[in-house]
């Protein structure tokens, strides 16, 4: 008797459970309507340069401290910034010698804290056409007055592209400038790449300070080249941005 009652009770509970799950509820629709969202775009007027960003952390704006920083270009496709390159004072040597550049000093977004970043160039493409672009560079020979630093070779290597965007262009890992004014490719952004803000930096910056030297930006001077003491030798690098990628 007890066994039968127990089984009957279990059967009743199970049946009750099935009854509960077999009773779905339906929401009664009483009406619907539609709404819209819209946006209208206007052209970037191209008159306001984009702030330079940290080439090692492109989400942060920086302010270069070099008083002779190059003038940015204007337009919807523009060259925002290029580092000057400083090798400082060096002792004359009669042997072939390679000199390393200083890092580029910038102020972080607080306007106070200094940071030392690799030599870099920054391009902004706000055209909205996704047509691509190309950055090239050339230079003349280092000179002090009319005296050339014959045979001097400027090398920019270990290039790294950086951006908050993902449509990555391609870059030359090494750029060699012989002072012959021949144009060298730096960055090529084919169609559907290179939109927004992009930096191309030469070298790394971990732990750099005002005394650090960047082994990725070098000047090689032959030992047999004449060198005048207390004279500053200067080369002009011409950076050219075009809207005709490869």
At which residue positions do the language-model features occur?
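Signature of Gram-negative chaperone-usher
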Residues: 4-8, 20, 24-246
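Bacterial N-terminal signal peptides
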Residues: 11-19
């Amino acid at each position: 008797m007890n066994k039968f009652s127990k089984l009957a009770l279990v059967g009743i509970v199970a049946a009750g459970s099935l009854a509960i799950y077999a009773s779905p509820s339906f929401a009664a629709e009483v009406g619907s309507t539609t709404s819209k969202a819209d946006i209208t775009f206007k052209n970037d007027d191209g008159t306001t340069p984009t702030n330079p960003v940290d080439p090692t952390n492109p989400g942060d704006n920086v302010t270069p401290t070099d008083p002779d920083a190059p003038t940015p270009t204007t337009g919807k496709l523009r060259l925002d910034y290029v580092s000057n390159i400083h090798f400082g004072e060096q002792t004359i040597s009669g042997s072939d010698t390679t000199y390393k550049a200083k890092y580029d000093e910038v102020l972080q977004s607080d306007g106070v804290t200094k940071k030392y970043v690799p030599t870099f160039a920054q391009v902004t493409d706000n055209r909205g056409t996704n047509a691509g672009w190309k950055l090239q560079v050339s230079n003349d020979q280092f000179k002090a007055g009319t005296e050339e630093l014959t045979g001097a070779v400027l090398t920019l290597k270990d290039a790294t592209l950086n951006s908050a965007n993902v449509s990555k262009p391609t870059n030359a890992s090494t750029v060699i400038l012989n002072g012959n004014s021949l144009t060298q490719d730096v960055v090529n952004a084919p169609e559907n790449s290179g939109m927004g803000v992009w930096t191309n930096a030469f070298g790394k910056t971990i732990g750099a300070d005002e005394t650090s030297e960047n082994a990725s930006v070098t000047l090689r001077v032959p030992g047999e080249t004449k060198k005048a003491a207390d004279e500053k030798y200067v080369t002009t690098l011409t950076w050219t941005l075009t809207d005709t990628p490869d």
